[in-house]
A protein has these predicted regions:
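Conserved coupling segment at the C-terminus of the helicase ATP-binding
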Residues: 1-333, 467
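Conserved RecA-like P-loop NTPase helicase motor core
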Residues: 264-283, 339-468
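Acidic, His- and aromatic-enriched active-site or binding-groove loops in soluble protein domains
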Residues: 329-348, 485-490
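Long, largely alpha-helical accessory region at the distal end of helicase-like NTP-driven motors
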Residues: 73, 304, 311-312, 447, ...
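Conserved NTP-handling cores and scaffolds of large molecular machines
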Residues: 10-13, 33, 37, 66, ...
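Surface-exposed flexible segments
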Residues: 4, 381-388, 474-483
């Protein structure tokens, strides 16, 4: 079995075995089930009617929990005990295993959703031909949610030891949700591995270096052998090391086709520190904008900039668009250098944005594309040749370590490491690596959007003081590490700009 794009395999397995349900979905499914029960109550056999009533009770219990949590807690999220979700009237008497068996065998969700859709279509036809008068109320078509709810109920029946339930508020604070998250993909992937004669994980960006690898793989002895240990520790921890082989290849381009800088300071000498506490500084954001102006002046064609999040990108753009007196704002000045485009979190067409960006480059204006790590532009889109003469990464996109979900993930990894015989320090290192590798895998994936063939060339600019630390450098792909400018921390911003100027002049002359 060969799995391509395997940098996604852990997240894919986790996502498949995770599920989220909102209070609004619970209410909608409860209402749909109520309509169905009222219509067919007399046709349902006694046993079926009992099971349907049990589903109603279970939905009421989950909805009541969310409503109580919404009213009595200010927390954005927290871990939830399974028992707390099953305290509704009569719920303790429900055999969840029998109920789930009934739902699967009877296909109740499909029947309810089919009836609701059919009833709505029939009502529309009656109104259109004048058989009944519209009631004046604007009703939205029912969304088939009971099948989704059934999936959540299945996790209540048999939650995995490595899974957790969470309560969370929606981003707009208009809804509350229950989440079930798989924290560790090992056991689910093991089922796949044991059915195969051999398994190959292949990918272009699979190498955040795990310092924790020494716990299990010191026998490998070479740096490249340890590069993929993050995957090994989380997918093959049950296998002896002699059954595992790793191979890390270099890039197809010659060394002279890449210049990579960890950029520590901006043009004014202000240190680039895009940690969560510091990155909101107006001075820092202005320094970033002025730095981009200088870079865009010497980098030809297309420049792609990746920000840690949509929220931070919005904040930066808002600051750059502020005007002081009659002087031009940073946003306008950037627009004079290159046509500026930005990725939107909304369902705006990626194709349209890319087409406009490409067109601006073809016309000689050049393009500056502001994107987000982990967003629509960071994977599956190739910025080859003129589309990506520079990739700039602003800061490090660490996930929120204070979130209940990440606390649970780290705690689980630390405990699993200890259970396998790891020392307390090794357990802590495993949790830290999980957190750092999640960040660096996203960074490496974004960097990999440029330089797509042997004759391609580009610059990689990593804007943050932390990119000069050995821990972070070792989590970059080998071909990037080899291209990093030495002693970059000691070099002024002007030296970096001069290096870029010389690099692109040399390439354009060949």
């Amino acid at each position: 079995m060969i799995i391509d794009e395997a940098h996604n395999v852990m997240d894919a397995i986790t996502s498949i075995h995770s599920i989220t349900i909102s209070l609004s979905q619970l209410k909608r499914s409860r209402a749909q089930l109520g309509v169905y029960l009222q219509k067919f109550r007399n046709r349902l056999k006694g046993k079926n009617r009992v099971y349907v009533t049990q589903v109603v009770r279970l939905l009421d219990s989950l909805a009541a929990y969310l409503q109580n949590k919404e009213a009595n807690t200010k927390q954005g999220e927290c871990i939830v005990k399974t028992a707390d979700l099953l305290v509704g009237k009569g719920v303790d008497q429900i055999n969840l295993y029998k109920l789930m068996h009934y739902l699967e065998e009877s296909k109740l969700a499909r029947k309810v959703e089919g009836y609701i859709i059919d009833a709505e279509e029939r009502e529309k036809k009656e109104v259109s031909v004048g058989l009944r008068q519209p009631d004046g109320k604007k009703t939205e078509p029912s969304v088939p949610v009971l099948t989704h709810v059934q999936g959540f109920l299945a996790t209540l029946t048999d939650p995995a030891p490595e899974g957790r339930f969470f309560f969370e508020r929606s981003e707009d604070d208009k809804d509350v949700r229950l989440k079930y998250r798989l924290l560790d993909p090992t056991h689910h992937f093991q089922e796949i591995v044991e059915d195969a004669r051999a398994v190959i994980l292949a990918g272009g960006t699979m190498s955040p270096v795990s310092l924790y690898s020494k716990l299990r793989f010191s026998c490998y002895g070479t740096h490249h052998d340890r590069q993929m240990s993050d995957y090994v520790n989380r997918l093959f921890s049950y296998l002896p090391s002699e059954r595992l082989t790793t191979l890390s290849c270099g890039h197809v381009i010659p060394a002279g086709n890449l210049v990579a800088w960890p950029v520590m300071k901006g043009p004014s000498g202000i240190e680039y520190d895009f940690t969560f506490d510091q990155r909101k500084s107006s001075t820092m954001v202005d320094e970033l904008g002025i730095g981009l102006l200088s870079m865009c002046h010497v980098i030809p064609d297309g420049v792609v900039v990746f920000f840690p999040s949509y929220a931070y990108l919005d904040q930066v753009v808002q600051r750059w668009q502020m005007r002081t007196g009659t002087s031009k704002c940073i946003w306008d000045r950037l627009g004079e250098k290159k046509a500026v485009f930005r990725e939107s979190k909304e369902n705006a067409s990626v194709e349209d944005t890319l087409q406009q960006y490409s067109s601006a480059i073809d016309k000689g204006k050049g393009g500056l594309l502001l994107s987000v790590v982990g967003g629509k532009m960071s994977e599956g889109i190739n910025f080859s040749d003129r589309l990506g003469r520079a990739v700039i990464v602003v800061g490090l996109p660490y996930p929120n370590i204070h979130s209940s979900e990440w606390k649970a993930k780290i705690e689980h990894v630390e405990k699993s490491t200890a259970d396998r015989g790891g020392s307390p320090s090794e357990s802590k290192a495993a949790g830290r690596d999980l957190y750092e590798n999640s960040c660096m895998r996203a960074v490496n994936q974004s960097i990999g959007r440029a330089i797509r063939h042997q004759n391609d060339y580009a610059s990689i600019l990593l804007l943050d003081r932390r990119y000069d630390t050995e821990r972070i450098k070792r989590k970059l792909p080998g071909w990037i590490r080899q291209g990093l400018v030495q002693d970059a921390a000691r070099q002024p911003f002007t030296e970096m700009v001069g290096s870029l100027t010389a690099f692109f002049r040399a390439k354009e002359a060949t």
